């Protein structure tokens, strides 16, 4: 029977949906054989299944039986939608996966990048503390290792390599970097200096080792990835927690470098003499050139080479110290590279010793010149003195231009260093033993304002006051100018060195004597090499090291008069480029840049000069303690600054105004000074090479010497340095002359520092300190080498005011006018030794001293006069040579004498500068009167004489006020002056350019006038930068008014412009300027037409300045300023820049961009306000009559002088405006002439507390030019002081009541509207009584002027 089988499977064998059920009928064969039709059925079913399978949609999971149905489905929206969704899901999934993986990768990359950045920041912060960008990573790593005492003793090679790589870039350090080395690490520079001495037993390295070291060019070393110290961003305000940390903050390598520098001398003298000679022979001039080109890399290599040989010898000694010592020795050994390498070595040794001393005695300010750092041990100081003497001798031998002589000199110096090294060994051993615990750190532990949080602050961000106890203050690193801080540190170190050198004059003298000839040629050669090549930026990395280098750069400068002097000043100015070897920077950037063609000539001249000056230098060595290598010129220069006896000599010179050769009061002053003149002459030449008046300055060094000595003689201390400066500056008219002057002034600045008058860099200016200052200033000089030529005004303004960069910019501008400004700075120097150095040293001083800036102005003014006199070839007069040349010498002598005397009594620098300025200003008034009345053609001689007398009178009367102003904020308002200086400089630049024909008496006179103006500005700078600007403007206004006296119409315009600026900027500033406050506004206010004419006719004005000496001068300045309103505004902006932060201590500085923006904003706001006020004033002014200020000039004035500090300027201007108005009302023909008649009798000397300096701007004391003993204990901030508005009736009516025109009265009444805020002034002294007194004095002055009219 057939079975019926129902197949229920819904799917085919292939998995396709079957959808049909087949019923198979038929008998089932028992045998299983299929029925006959089974095959057919099977095939049919299979075909159906296949067909149906073809109609199955997997995506939609649908089975279609018909082809058309299937096609319809495939084309349907549902099917397409599902397809899209499927694809989208797939894509999204893939995207998600990819994005996730990408994000993960990015996160990883970000994390890695962040880690790298952190590591970089840590290294940089450590490097900053180490002051060595060239050695950032190595310093960080090595400092950590040194501090932790982790010194791989793998034969001392690893550590040696590390330290060598850091300091010497691949130099193998001594293999013995064991616990001894660790112990000595804190006293690294000591150990470095004594490495040979202390570890003489360790210097077991044989000559084979030495040869091996020479062959070991490559070294393998590793730096720890972790940074030992990290700068905490939260540390914005802090107090010094530990002094030891400050000592440690210098990177151990840095200190080691210092120590090595010192040790170099010792080892070089003892064991490395042969090595040194060998290395001298081995190293080729091309190598030197390469070293000069790459001071960091090549110096490191040279140090490496020397290290290799010296390392082998000293390998047993402390590895790092030996390495530094070797590198230092190597530097000195390499004659062709003595400048950069020796400087580097000296700086390294200096830093090393300094650091060693720093740990034990961070607060100790007396440090031998090698130890530029303030903190030092007596023993270390001795060692440093020895080292400095040895090192300078070494350097001098290195300086020898002839390799043979260099080698011989080095041999001699090595002998000396051997002797010294023994002492140093003892001293260093003791010091190291005592100071092993302290280790150099890149940071100081400081306390945050909360009082309990200890922050690690970079050493570079810390500045220490010179007072005892030392107070450290810092600023936000974001706004911190590290180069500037280095400069400041160097200045402090220079002061210490100065003191130390004063202590050890005999040692240094003897050593220098033996070293002068030795280093001369080598240093000259090195200087020339450096001069030829771009300045390496390695040397300046460490401020101490730079200081050390600078000291020896000064030596080098002496060796190479042009380059050396230039280098010195450039280095001083080069503080801005602390990473470049000081002397290298100066000579290379400025001299090489400017006088590459004349380089060889300068070099030759330097060699000849050095050879000719060696004897003088040797003589100077006896007298000059700290400048063994500064050969005669610097010796002489330094001799004067040699703190103890030099100060005395300076005083003595002040008494003996006439002996130019007795500048330092030293036995060899004549000879040395004449040599110095030659040196300065050459140096100035090389420095002026860029300016194009190199030869002009060369001819004048001797004459300048006379002037210099005369100016030095004028004042007890200040005069001495002034004369040095004057001779150097005048004959050089360049940074070199400034350098010389600066050294003397440095010495005097020590004096002043003692007087508390100059607590800043001035104090460093003792001989050794001068050296150190030069060393640290050399970067400044290098940066501002051009400034040296023209930085007098601008450098100070910028340097003091804000930044080395500003200063450098100014320097660039001022370079063109270096000669003129140098002379003026010389007179400033007479006013104040530090300022006296011209701007050469002032850049560093600017940081610390407003007096310096003021002096810089004065000196610049003097320099203008000097230049004019030089042009007249009246260089015979000692002190007043330059002024005397253009004008009767007595004018300058009197002015400078007055200045010096005033300065000597009080803040000599400020008073002198003010006095000189004041003298010139009244002189101008008198001259203008004479010229206007008599219209005599004796412009040159008459102007000179009249200027001399008038300057004195003016100094007594109007300038006394500036003096007062200047003295008041002597420590506070540095920045204000620089801007004024900038403006003045701008005008002065024009003046100088116009007086590119310096011989032209007219130009000289105009320069003289400008000088006076600047002096006044400098004066005000101390008190208020605004005051400064005002005084400066007053002087110029007086000169303008006087000049316009010839034409009543012109006078009326100037008066209007003059008075208007006062109206605009005259907030009640009772103490600022009693009667005449020249205002930068005034410059702007000056008749645009007239000003433009004056500017356009600047040269003519220079000529007419003979007729209108002061007026012409001021006019030329103002006219130039007015001629180019943009320039005037720029200048005013600069003034504002300097004025706005003047009272704030420089250490707290903002970036130049921030300062500019801030100042611009303030200027705009104040200009707007003043425009409104001026519009009101102008409305009233017409009633004043013809003498009233013209609206045009007033309008001009307003925009010119708006600034944050303008309120102060306004106050001063209002006063000056009222005075001018009264004067103009009384006599339109000579409005300013009335001011100058004021005599000192009108102003009684007033002494103020430390806070009063800011308040005193208008005090009679300042007006009288009496020295005020004002010391700013703390930086003054604008918030600290707000001038109390005086009742218009109380202030102005009393002062101007009888003399004021209606317009003037109205303007004066507007004064209260402007509330002068003296950033650094304390109003306790700005009492109504003092204001009334000042008003009365101004009244008297006005009366006198009226009588004169």
From Swiss-Prot:
Zn-finger (C2H2-type) residues: 55-79
Q: Where is this region: Disordered?
A: 985-1010
Protein's recorded name: Zinc finger protein 804B
GO MF terms on file? zinc ion binding
Where does this protein come from, organism-wise? Homo sapiens
The protein's matches in InterPro entries, at most eight in alphabetical order, are given as: ZnF-G_patch_domain, Znf_C2H2_sf, Znf_C2H2_type
Q: Which SUPFAM superfamilies match?
A: beta-beta-alpha zinc fingers
One GO cellular component assignment for this chain's record is: nucleus
Any idea which UniProt keywords this protein has? Metal-binding, Zinc, Zinc-finger
């Amino acid at each position: 029977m057939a079975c019926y089988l129902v197949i229920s499977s819904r799917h085919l064998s292939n998995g396709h949906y079957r959808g049909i059920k087949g019923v198979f009928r038929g008998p089932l064969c028992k045998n299983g054989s299929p029925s006959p039709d089974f095959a057919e059925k099977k095939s049919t079913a299979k075909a159906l299944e296949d067909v149906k399978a073809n109609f199955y949609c997997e995506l939609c999971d649908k089975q279609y039986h018909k082809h058309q149905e299937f096609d319809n489905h495939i084309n349907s929206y549902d099917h397409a939608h599902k397809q899209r969704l499927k694809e989208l899901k797939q894509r999204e999934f893939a995207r998600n996966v990819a994005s996730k993986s990408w994000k993960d990768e990015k996160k990883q990359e970000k994390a890695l990048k962040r880690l790298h950045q952190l590591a970089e920041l840590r290294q940089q912060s450590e490097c900053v503390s180490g002051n060595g960008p060239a050695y950032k990573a190595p310093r960080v790593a090595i400092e950590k290792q040194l501090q932790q005492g982790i010194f791989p003793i793998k034969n001392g090679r690893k550590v040696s390599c590390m330290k060598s790589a850091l300091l010497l870039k691949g130099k193998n350090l001594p293999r013995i970097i064991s616990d001894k080395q660790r112990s000595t690490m804190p006293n690294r520079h000591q150990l470095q200096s004594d490495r040979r001495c202390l570890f003489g037993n360790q210097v077991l390295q044989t000559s084979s080792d030495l040869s091996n070291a020479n062959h070991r060019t490559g070294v393998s070393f590793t730096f720890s990835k972790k940074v030992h110290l990290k700068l905490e961003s939260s540390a914005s305000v802090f107090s010094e927690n530990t002094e030891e940390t400050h000592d440690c903050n210098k990177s151990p390598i840095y200190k080691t470098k210092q120590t090595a520098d010192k040790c170099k001398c010792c080892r070089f003298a003892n064991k490395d003499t042969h090595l040194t000679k060998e290395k001298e022979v081995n190293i080729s001039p091309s190598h030197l050139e390469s070293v000069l080109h790459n001071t960091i890399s090549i110096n490191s290599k040279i140090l490496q080479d020397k290290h290799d040989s010296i390392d082998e010898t000293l390998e047993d000694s402390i590895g790092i110290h030996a390495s530094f010592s070797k590198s230092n020795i190597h530097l000195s050994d390499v004659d062709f590279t003595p400048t950069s390498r020796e400087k580097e070595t000296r700086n390294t040794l200096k830093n090393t010793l300094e650091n060693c001393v720093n740990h034990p005695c961070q607060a100790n300010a007396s440090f031998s010149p090698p130890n530029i750092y303030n903190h030092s041990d007596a023993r270390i100081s001795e060692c440093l003195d020895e080292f400095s003497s040895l090192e300078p001798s070494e350097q001098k031998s290195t300086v020898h231009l002839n390799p043979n002589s260099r080698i011989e000199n080095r041999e001699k110096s090595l002998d000396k260093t051997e002797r010294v090294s023994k002492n140093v060994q003892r001293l260093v051993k003791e010091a190291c033993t005592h100071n092993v615990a302290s280790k150099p750190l890149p940071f100081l532990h400081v306390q945050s304002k909360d009082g309990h949080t200890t922050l690690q602050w970079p050493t570079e961000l810390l500045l220490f006051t010179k007072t005892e106890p030392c107070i450290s203050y810092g600023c936000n690193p974001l706004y911190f100018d590290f180069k500037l801080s280095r400069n400041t540190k160097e200045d402090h170190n220079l002061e210490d060195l100065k003191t130390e050198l004063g202590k050890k004059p005999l040692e240094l003298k003897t050593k220098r004597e033996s070293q002068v000839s030795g280093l001369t040629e080598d240093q000259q050669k090195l200087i020339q090499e450096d001069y030829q090549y771009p300045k390496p930026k390695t040397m300046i990395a460490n401020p101490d090291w730079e200081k050390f280098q600078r000291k020896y750069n000064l030596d080098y400068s002496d060796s190479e008069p042009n380059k050396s002097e230039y280098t010195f000043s450039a280095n001083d100015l080069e503080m801005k480029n602390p990473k470049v070897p000081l002397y290298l920077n100066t000579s290379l950037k400025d001299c090489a840049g400017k006088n590459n063609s004349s380089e060889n000539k300068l070099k030759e001249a330097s060699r000849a000069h050095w050879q000719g000056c060696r004897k003088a230098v040797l003589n100077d060595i006896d007298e000059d303690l700290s400048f063994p290598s500064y050969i005669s010129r610097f010796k002489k220069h330094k001799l004067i600054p040699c703190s103890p006896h030099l100060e005395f000599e300076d005083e003595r010179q002040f008494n003996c105004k006439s002996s130019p050769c007795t500048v330092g009061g030293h036995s060899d002053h004549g000879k040395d000074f004449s040599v110095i003149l030659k040196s300065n002459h050459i140096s100035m030449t090389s420095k002026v090479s860029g300016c194009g008046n190199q030869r002009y300055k060369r001819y004048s060094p001797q004459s300048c010497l006379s002037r210099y000595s005369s100016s030095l003689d004028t004042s007890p201390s200040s005069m001495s340095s002034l004369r040095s400066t004057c001779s150097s500056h005048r004959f050089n008219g360049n940074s070199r002359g400034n350098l010389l002057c600066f050294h003397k002034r440095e010495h005097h600045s020590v004096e002043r520092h003692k007087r508390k008058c100059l607590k800043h860099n001035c104090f460093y200016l003792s001989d050794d300190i001068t050296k150190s200052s030069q060393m640290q200033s050399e970067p400044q000089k290098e940066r501002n080498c051009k400034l040296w030529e023209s930085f007098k005004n601008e450098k100070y303004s910028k340097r003091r005011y804000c930044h080395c960069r500003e200063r450098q910019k100014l320097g660039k501008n001022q370079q063109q006018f270096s000669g003129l400004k140098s002379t003026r700075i010389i007179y400033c120097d007479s006013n104040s030794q530090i300022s006296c150095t011209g701007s050469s040293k002032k850049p560093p001083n600017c940081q610390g001293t407003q007096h310096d800036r003021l002096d810089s102005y004065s000196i610049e003014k003097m320099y203008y006069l000097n230049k004019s006199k030089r042009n007249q070839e009246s260089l015979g007069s000692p002190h007043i040579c330059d002024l005397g040349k253009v004008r009767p010498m007595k004018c300058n002598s009197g002015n400078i004498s007055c200045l010096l005397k005033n300065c000597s009594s009080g803040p000599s620098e400020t008073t002198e500068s003010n006095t000189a300025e004041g003298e010139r200003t009244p002189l101008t008034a008198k001259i203008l009167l004479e010229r206007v009345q008599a219209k005599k053609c004796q412009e040159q001689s008459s102007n000179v004489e009249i200027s001399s007398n008038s300057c004195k009178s003016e100094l007594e009367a109007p300038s006394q006020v500036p003096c007062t102003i200047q003295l008041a904020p002597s420590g506070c308002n540095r920045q204000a002056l620089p801007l004024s200086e900038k403006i003045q400089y701008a005008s002065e630049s024009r003046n100088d350019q116009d007086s590119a024909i310096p011989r032209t008496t007219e130009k000289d006179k105009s320069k003289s006038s400008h000088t006076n103006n600047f002096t006044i500005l400098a004066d005000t700078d101390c008190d208020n930068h605004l005051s400064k600007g005002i005084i400066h403007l007053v002087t110029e206004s007086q000169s303008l008014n006087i000049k316009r006296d010839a034409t009543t119409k012109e006078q009326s315009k100037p008066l209007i412009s003059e008075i208007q600026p006062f109206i605009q900027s005259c907030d009640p500033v009772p103490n600022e300027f009693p009667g005449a406050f020249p205002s930068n506004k005034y410059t702007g206010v000056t008749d645009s037409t007239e000003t433009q004419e004056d500017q356009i006719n600047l040269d003519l004005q220079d000529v007419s300045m003979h007729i209108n000496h002061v007026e012409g001068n001021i006019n030329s300045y103002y006219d130039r300023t007015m001629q180019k309103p943009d320039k005037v505004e720029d200048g005013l902006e600069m003034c504002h820049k300097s004025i706005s932060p003047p009272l704030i201590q420089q250490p707290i500085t903002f970036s130049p961009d921030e300062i500019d923006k801030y100042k611009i904003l303030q200027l705009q706001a104040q200009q707007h306000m003043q425009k409104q006020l001026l519009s009101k004033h102008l409305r009233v002014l017409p009633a004043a009559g013809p003498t009233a200020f013209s609206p045009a000039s007033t309008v001009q004035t307003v925009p010119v002088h708006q600034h944050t500090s303008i309120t102060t300027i306004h106050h001063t201007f209002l006063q000056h405006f009222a005075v001018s108005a009264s004067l103009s009302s009384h006599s339109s023909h000579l409005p300013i002439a009335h001011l100058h008649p004021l005599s000192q009798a009108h102003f009684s000397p007033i002494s103020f507390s430390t806070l009063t300096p800011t308040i005193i701007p208008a005090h009679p004391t300042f007006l009288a030019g009496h020295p005020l003993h004002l010391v700013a204990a703390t930086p003054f901030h604008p918030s600290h002081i707000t001038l109390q508005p005086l009742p218009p009736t109380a202030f102005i009516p009393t002062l101007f009541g009888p003399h004021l025109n209606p317009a003037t009265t109205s303007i004066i009444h507007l004064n209260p509207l402007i509330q002068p805020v003296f950033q650094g002034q304390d109003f306790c002294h700005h009492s109504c009584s003092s204001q009334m007194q000042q008003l009365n004095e101004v009244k008297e002055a006005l009366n006198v002027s009226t009588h004169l009219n």
